[in-house]
Amino acid sequence: QQRSSAASDVYKRQLFDQRGCGQSTPHAELAHNNTHNLLSDIEKIRTMFSIDKWLVFGGSWGSTLSLVYAQNYPKHVLGLILRGIFLCRPHDISWFYQDGISRIFPDYWEDYISIIPPNERQDILTAFYNRLTGKNEIEQMAAAKAWSLLEGRCATLKPNVNFASHFETPHTALAMARIESHYFINNAFLEPGQIENNIDQIRHIPTTIVHGRYDMVCPVYQAFDLARNWPEAELKIIADAGHSSSEPGIVHELVSATEQFAHTHLKRD
């Protein structure tokens, strides 16, 4: 969906929907859905296609998963291209779901929490999780749409109604909200500081980090924290972009990064 690249004839792309998302089944399922199993799924894809080493590309939660995958399987990773860094630490999660985004978009936040009684608002994540995993289907869908719409509204630098409305579609909203809340309430099934404490495992891997200056979903401090501990990685902060991968400046730098990687690290037949 993004602009064609001169490197498109160099790469064989393997795209997948993680457990419970997109076209994966069962839809929005939480059983056996954790980070360890996602890493195992990625490895199964790699071995199924007889890939020895590959360039791993991921954004937002995909950047989290890419980093953890690379730290567990560094010998199979040629390089990393990461967008919208999400380190998934407790304060990173709290920024969006408790006490950060509410200060930037108070009107969107009021819409978001309107379905939660005042006496439960001291822990918004738990309140939503309880509804998203409860048996009341009406409450579940209302929570899913509210959860997903907030992210859709906050993901672009400029308001984009069409972009945000996609997040409210039932199929998308239910999977996004249920699975995100499941991971976040469990701190993404990661140990405290796991990503930062294991940078030495991937320090040698060529890496480009692309992050929007005005990213309100995963604020740019997360990319800066990562790059400060990993000076070998290249950090590109995009001056006129938010979180979404569809932001023009983000698209440009991601395509440039894939082209540059192909030129520098891949041999053409």
Q: Predicted segments — roles?
A:
Residues 233-269:
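Catalytic active-site module of serine/aspartate enzymes centered on a nucleophile-bearing elbow/loop
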Residues 16-33, 91:
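Glycine-rich "HGGG/HGxG" loop immediately N-terminal to the catalytic nucleophile
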Residues 52-91:
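Conserved hydrolase catalytic core segment
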Residues 216-222:
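Conserved alpha/beta-hydrolase "acid-adjacent" motif
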Residues 75-128:
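A catalytic-pocket lid/entrance helix-loop region that shapes and gates access to the active site
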Residues 202-203, 209-211:
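Short beta-strand/loop motif that positions the catalytic acidic residue
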Residues 36-54:
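Conserved acidic catalytic loop of the alpha/beta-hydrolase fold
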Residues 1-7, 11:
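Single conserved hydrophobic/aromatic residue that forms the stacking wall/gate
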